[in-house]
Amino acid sequence: MEGAGAARKRSRPDTANGGAAGGKRSRETESFQTGLSSKLKPCTKFFSTIGCPFGEGCHFSHFVPGGYQAVAKTLNLGNPAVPAPARAPMDHAAGGNSHPASSGKTRMCTKYNTAEGCKFGDKCHFAHGERELGKPAYMSHESAMAPPMGGRYGGRPEPPPPAAMGPPAGNFGASATAKISVDASLAGGIIGKGGVNTKQICRVTGVKLSIRDHESDSNLKNIELEGNFDQIKQASNMVGELIATISPSTPAKKPAGSAAGAAPAGRGGPGGRSNYKTKLCENFVKGTCTFGDRCHFAHGENEQRKGAA
């Protein structure tokens, strides 16, 4: 009798413990399975004007393809365009500031521009910036996955830069035209054989060069340069160097009435010009001579000739 009683006493705690453990495991399994099955159902509070207070810990789904429209059709919530009136709308679950909720974001969020920021993010019933004013308070899953409007501590997003209106200020009115009046006898030397000199000036500087008759003096020619200011300045310097090379002793605007003025008409070689290669080229010493072998000045003492007696 005592042995049987002891056996019963020993078996009762085991049975009790086993029963308790089994009951606990069965309840956990049931709760787990219930949680899995409930995640397949949409949260009716989340898709209402009240909002779900459980957040990510909710056992029901907060993300349904199609958003509120699909949930309203599935659960027969009536007209999806007119949400049910809220019984206890709140600004924030932890803030305690009560504001009436509506189908659109009509007021600014009081927590968004603070140091701690708004913890509700895209689910907030209030606008995070002026661009969200008037937008629906409840957006679908696709819109919730869109990039945020700003950082946690950011304020209003910066507007895009305005489009450029017309050409830049630096290029406005840059094109210009300049005239250089020279002796008509120098025109052939400035043009060069086959236009080699004028072509080189246009190729190096990028200007448009043309030689025309003077308006009033038949003994002069106008060299017209068209381009921007830097191009015209560079071309003018090259024309001045060319004129000095052709006739270093003849002024640019001196009429060709004397023998000295008529002499520079031809380019010629050592036999055709008495001052050919008789002086050193100043630009060659500086390394800025652009005429090369066609230069009428000596590029070094080995090319320098003695002037005619």
From Swiss-Prot:
Cellular component aspect of the GO annotation: cytoplasm
UniProt keyword list: DNA-binding, Metal-binding, Repeat, RNA-binding, Zinc, Zinc-finger
ZnF endpoints (C3H1-type): 37-65, 103-131, 275-302
Keyword match Zinc: yes
Region Disordered: start-end pairs: 1-36, 86-106, 249-273
A GO BP annotation: regulation of gene expression
GO MF entry, a single one: zinc ion binding
A Pfam family matched in the record: zf-CCCH_2
Low complexity composition-biased segments: 251-265
Record-annotated KH domain positions: 175-239
PANTHER family, alphabetized: CCCH ZINC FINGER/TIS11-RELATED (PTHR12547), ZINC FINGER CCCH DOMAIN-CONTAINING PROTEIN 52 (PTHR12547:SF154)
Protein name in UniProt: Zinc finger CCCH domain-containing protein 31
Native species: Oryza sativa subsp. japonica
